[in-house]
Amino acid sequence: EQAARVLALDHWMARGVALNAPGPLWRAEGEASGLPPPHLSAQDIVWIEGYLQEPSGFNSAGEPVALNFATGELDTRQLRHPDGVILDIGTHVLAMLRETLHASGGDTALSLSLRVAKDRLGHDIAPGDTSTAEGEAHLQGTLGTIPLNIWLNKYAGPAGGQKGMRIGLRDGRIITFDRAPEGEVVTLQDGERVQRWTRPGAIYTHCLDEQILGADNLFIRAPDSVAGLTQRRLEEVEWLLRLQQQLRGPH
């Protein structure tokens, strides 16, 4: 049975909405005490980066191995294309970046190229290889006229775990959005001065509340935006599939 409407979501979208719709859940810390998180305008943005650096362990041979999300134990699965970082986690990062820019009044037209694609052991993915999963990738392009870089790594080692974005502002300040031990954190860096805000709770929960199930969900507050939001998610998948075809050849 065909649905009358389709809504394409990604839980990371909630991070973009959060920056320009701060609610009472945001808590200022230290120097930021009493101040709301920074309001973002697309006119102020000169560059934007997204990153997902997943923690990993090592097998008995000293090779990097992914970790199971639920248990933190070594993931014994043998990942194969298309389960590499480009399609697996590139979708999350793109959704976060584009929804942030959209909420800031910016142009979300996407242009993207693949700069680096390596396997789990750090070897380049060879043209024509339609089986090896990418463990690391660097994507580069533009959102509208804003330079864009995306850094993806499933094997970032024990120090991994960074998931978020950095936004360079015209006045030299940098906004960073990352995860915190029990939620999310926004920092505003101005030289050596750093202001910080945190929001407890999982991104999944925030997205469900803000976009689907909450009293002020997307269908209530902005029903006319559903089609555009879905179109952006489809465009992102199309771009990533296109990069895979360019990297590996038609398949």
Predicted region positions:
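Predominantly a Rossmann-like dinucleotide-binding segment in NAD(P)-dependent oxidoreductases
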Residues: 2-105
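Generic structural motif
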Residues: 48, 106-119, 173-177, 185-186
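Short, solvent-exposed loop/turn segments at secondary-structure junctions
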Residues: 14-15, 53-56, 117-119, 155-157, ...
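Short, surface-exposed alpha-helical recognition segments that flank or form part
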Residues: 43, 81-88, 199, 203, ...
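A structural signal for well-ordered alpha-helical scaffolds and beta->alpha junctions
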Residues: 14, 29, 90-97, 160, ...
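NAD(P)-dinucleotide binding in Rossmann-like oxidoreductases
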Residues: 126-213
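Rossmann-like dinucleotide-binding domain that binds NAD(P)(H)
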Residues: 58, 68-159, 235-238
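C-terminal helix-rich "cap/oligomerization" subdomain common to oxidoreductases
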Residues: 211-251
